[in-house]
């Protein structure tokens, strides 16, 4: 009720405030009208009779409005007084009601506190009663358990007296033996008797065997009557032998034989596992064939890497033995690395030129270059009539022979025109075994074989000027691949702690002096793909080939090289610009 009254008074005061603003605006308007009606704007002389001034105001209307506004103001003042009185009378009533409420609240709080105290007392009394009940219940249970135990364990008086009368004497009990002890002693005696019987039977068997042996030996002995004739016979034989030795003394001669026989396979046992072995007898091997000096070595069709790794292994072995090798200084190594970087940058520029050459203003991709070469190869007239024309990939001049003028280059080899082999010929000659250092640091056994290069068929296409320009670009790509191989070798040597870096780097930069080595990239151009697959490759060669195939060469250049390799064309290059050194005869020695 009180809240509703206070809310109503607040609402009335709000409405009065709004009304006050309206009245103030009306007062301003009425005062304006009054001022306008009082002040004349124009003289009446200027007006035409019967004409109304539009800007003039009605004084009567202005007065009526002002009167009504004054009434509203008076009414507002009365309402304001009523609201103010109502608001003033509320605090006194509110204070009186608040005092009564506080007194009642005090009585209620005191009653609540008293009830809380009584509840706490009741809780304490109840808990005490519950605890006493539990204790009494436990005592009752203990009593019941005691009664049950007494019922089970208590003895009858008559039974107790009878048992006391029949109890055993202490002296008689001491003379008795326990049954467990008696059983254990009996078992032990039985075991001992069985052992004695077994020993006696064994001794009897041994005695019988010994007796049989003695009887057999006695039967095999000579009788005393038989000893005298035997003695007489031996003496007669001895005398006859001595007489023969005296009459014919032995002739001692030196050992001579037309031929001798020696055991080649001897019987041995392994020191670790004691396994029987049949191995050859070590010793000097007698050669049955005359020793002839070998022919001069030729350059190998295998890459330089096999020789370089073998040279690194030999250098490390010689260093372990104590021999001294010249070391490459850091300046030479830096110059070599700088030259390597310059060649690599030049090769990248050439690669870009190749792409622009095939693609025009836009760099050609690998697929574009492959399709372009394929269409050029198919549209070439040599391809259309390749079966009818002769092979002009080699020079038609007959090969010179004899003297130092027979020194030829791989790309200037002459082939007899009257021969037309239909298949590839491979002749293998076995040589000594060699050690090959693998990338994992282990040394593997390899065998040196000699293989002649394959002879191309007559279906190889000819060489054109356009293809010559492409071959020059391919040679530059081959140089890039060679540089990448050198970088891979350098990384592999850095990974092996026992390899010496400076000598190996010097060997990689400078061409090796060993004639039995060649470059993998150049030989892959001169040998057909079928023959190259048939050749055995060492573990180093396989790893290097896999590294070259997975290296960071752009795919378009690699496809260009593969498509151009399928043409199997040869071009005359000056010795200074070639990729290989001149060789004497066919380059055929390979390590695998």
Swiss-Prot record:
Question: Does the entry feature the keyword Membrane, yes or no?
Answer: yes
Q: Where is this region: Disordered?
A: 488-592
Any Gene Ontology biological process: flagellated sperm motility
Q: Where are the transmembrane segments?
A: none
Q: Which GO terms describe its cellular component?
A: cytoplasm; nuclear membrane; nucleus; sperm flagellum
Keyword flag Nucleus: yes
Q: Keywords in UniProt for this one? A: Cell projection, Cilium, Cytoplasm, Flagellum, Membrane, Nucleus, Repeat
Bias (Polar residues) ranges: 544-567
Signal sequence coordinates: none
**What does the record say about tissue specificity?**
Expressed in testis. Not detected in heart, brain, kidney, stomach, ovary, liver, lung and uterus.
Null mutant phenotype reads: Knockout mice show coiled, bent, irregular, short or absent flagella, defects of sperm flagellar ultrastructure, a significant reduction in sperm locomotion, and decreased sperm count.
Q: Which InterPro entries match?
A: DUF4795
Q: Where in the cell is it found?
A: Nucleus membrane; Nucleus; Cytoplasm; Cell projection, Cilium, Flagellum
Its quaternary structure?
Interacts with AKAP3, ODF2 and TSSK4. Interacts with AKAP4.
Query: What function does the entry list?
Result: Has an essential role in the formation of sperm flagella and flagellar structure maintainance. It acts as a suppressor of ubiquitination and degradation of proteins involved in flagellar development and motility.
Stated name of the protein: Glutamine-rich protein 2
Q: Which taxonomic lineage does the organism of this UniProt entry have?
A: Eukaryota, Metazoa, Chordata, Craniata, Vertebrata
Designated gene of the protein: Qrich2
């Amino acid at each position: 009720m009180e809240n509703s009254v206070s809310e109503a008074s607040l609402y009335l005061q709000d409405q009065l405030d709004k009304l006050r603003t309206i009245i103030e605006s009306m007062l301003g308007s009425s005062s304006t009208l009054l001022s306008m009606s009082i002040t004349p704007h124009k003289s009446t002389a200027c007006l035409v009779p019967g004409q109304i001034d539009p800007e003039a105001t009605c004084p009567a209307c202005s007065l009526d409005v002002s009167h009504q506004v004054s009434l509203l103001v008076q009414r507002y003042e009365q309402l304001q007084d009523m609201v103010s009185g109502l608001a003033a009378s509320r605090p006194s009533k509110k204070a009186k009601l608040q005092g009564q409420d506080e007194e009642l609240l005090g009585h209620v709080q005191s009653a609540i506190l008293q009830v809380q105290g009584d509840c706490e007392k009741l809780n304490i009394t109840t808990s005490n009663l519950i605890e006493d009940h539990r204790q009494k219940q436990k005592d009752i249970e203990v009593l019941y358990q005691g009664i049950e135990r007494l019922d089970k364990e208590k003895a009858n008086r008559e039974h107790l007296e009878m048992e006391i009368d029949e109890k055993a004497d202490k002296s008689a009990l001491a003379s008795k033996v326990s049954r467990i002890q008696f059983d254990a002693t009996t078992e032990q005696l039985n075991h001992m008797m069985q052992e004695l019987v077994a020993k006696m039977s064994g001794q009897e068997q041994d005695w019988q065997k010994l007796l049989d042996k003695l009887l057999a030996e006695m039967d095999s002995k000579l009788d005393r009557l038989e000893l005298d004739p035997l003695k007489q016979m031996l003496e007669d034989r001895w005398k006859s032998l001595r007489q023969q030795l005296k009459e014919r003394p032995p002739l001692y001669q030196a050992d001579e034989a037309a031929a001798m026989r020696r055991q080649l396979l001897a019987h041995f046992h392994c020191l670790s596992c004691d396994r029987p072995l049949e191995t050859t007898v070590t010793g000097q091997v007698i050669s049955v064939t005359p020793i002839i000096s070998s022919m001069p070595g030729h350059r190998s069709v295998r890459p330089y890497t096999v020789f370089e790794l073998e040279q690194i292994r030999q250098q490390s072995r010689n260093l372990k033995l104590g021999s001294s090798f010249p070391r490459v200084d850091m300046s030479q190594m830096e110059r070599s690395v700088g030259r390597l970087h310059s060649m690599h940058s030049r090769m990248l520029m050439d690669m870009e030129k190749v792409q622009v050459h095939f693609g025009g203003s836009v760099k050609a991709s690998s697929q574009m270059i492959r399709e372009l070469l394929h269409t050029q190869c198919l549209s070439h007239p040599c391809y259309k009539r390749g079966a009818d024309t002769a092979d002009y990939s080699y020079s038609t001049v007959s090969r010179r022979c004899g003297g130092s003028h027979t020194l030829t280059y791989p790309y200037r080899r002459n082939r007899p025109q009257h021969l037309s082999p239909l298949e590839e010929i491979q002749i293998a000659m076995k040589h000594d075994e060699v050690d090959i250092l693998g990338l994992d640091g282990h040394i593997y056994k390899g065998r040196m074989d000699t293989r002649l290069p394959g002879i191309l068929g007559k279906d190889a296409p000819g060489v054109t000027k356009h293809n010559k320009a492409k071959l020059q670009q391919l040679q530059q790509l081959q140089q890039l691949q060679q540089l990448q191989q050198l970088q891979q070798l350098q990384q592999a040597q850095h990974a092996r702690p026992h390899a010496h870096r400076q000598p190996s780097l010097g060997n990689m930069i400078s061409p090796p002096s060993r004639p039995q080595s060649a470059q993998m990239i150049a030989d892959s151009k001169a040998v057909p793909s079928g023959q190259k697959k048939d050749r055995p490759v060492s573990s180093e060669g396989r790893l290097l080939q896999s590294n070259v195939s997975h290296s960071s060469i752009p795919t378009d250049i690699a496809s260009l090289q593969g498509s151009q390799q399928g043409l199997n064309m040869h071009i005359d290059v000056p010795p200074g610009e070639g990729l290989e050194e001149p060789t004497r005869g066919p380059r055929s020695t390979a390590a695998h």
